[in-house]
Amino acid sequence: MPIDGSQASPRGTTTEALNLRLGSAPDSWGVWFPEDERQLPYDRFLDELAGAGYEWLELGPYGYLPTDPEVLADEVGKRGLKVSGGTVFGNLHRPEKFAETIDIVSKVAKLTASQGAKHVVFIPPLFRDEKTDAINDVTEWDATQWKTVHATANRIGKQMFEEYGVTIALHPHADCQIMTQPQIETFLDGTDSDYVSLCLDTGHVAYGGGDNVDLIRRYGERIGYVHIKQMDPEILRQVRDEGLGFGEAVKRGVCVEPPAGVPNPADIVAELSTLDAELLVIVEQDLYPCEPDVPFPIAVRTRKYLGGCGLGAGRQQS
């Protein structure tokens, strides 16, 4: 029985932003890890993604979806899906971790390129454990570490572009040393725009107290990829007041579907539509862990809502 993602749009339509393409990711189905008993099997995720009306998908944690290029292409292709990019965690500030980082980034870049995609979303490791919230690294980088970060990011970006034709898109993240707007700007100001771009994650920018619209206006030429996400202002207040880690914040429901949170998706779409670039805009609503029947209806409602903001998903639904 096919999955039907049709429903009435929650808001009126507006002019479609022709330079933007909407997709989604395993994250929006509660997937954070390659393997976890609380996560959906990948075939159900792909079925529901297609059924919800999305055409583009990000690969998510390496090993969740098949890593054999032919198997992955078959699984994606038979559902009418396209790969927008890969996702990888890697260390930038510890030179002794470079070999380990370049190994996993290369694997993800190779798989990503095999599917015709051009972006690898790069997330530095968090300084808190995602499950326990325990702090396990420095929370801020000093000047020497920033110098290492810039050099390492440029080196990885250049190597991945030359070997696989992909661009590294740095993803600011909660509980990461690149989280606040000043930290994001410091990273961008010290890296090579030919090889390193920004994955603008609207929710994580808001989580870190940043201004998405300001970043788009001042660093628009560095934005190569987008995660669109909303955060609950009340949970953000709890994060600040109680010193919560991101894992606990997600359990409390910090990531919400539009239009419940910040930033306003319509404002983001309007600003992105002015950029001289074609951008993939991937829905990421962190839900880990969640009941298996929770993600699909949220994904349908989110696609409909964002379509009303001018973000087309490509796949037509009745």
Where are the regions a protein language model picked out?
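C-terminal helical cap(s) of enzyme catalytic domains, especially alpha/beta-barrels
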Residues: 293-315
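Active-site acidic/histidine proton-transfer and metal-coordination neighborhood
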Residues: 3-11, 97-198, 278
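Boundary/entry segment of secreted carbohydrate-active catalytic domains
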Residues: 10-41
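Short, flexible, mixed-charge acidic loops at enzyme active sites
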Residues: 36-41, 126-136, 235-248
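Acidic (Asp/Glu)-rich catalytic clusters
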Residues: 12-19, 46-51, 65-85, 103-117, ...
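Conserved, mostly hydrophobic/aromatic
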Residues: 24, 49, 57, 76, ...
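Acidic-and-aromatic substrate-binding clefts and catalytic sites of carbohydrate-active enzymes
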Residues: 33-38, 56-71, 91-103, 174-180, ...
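Acidic/histidine-rich catalytic cores of soluble enzymes
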Residues: 24, 56-57, 151-262, 311-317
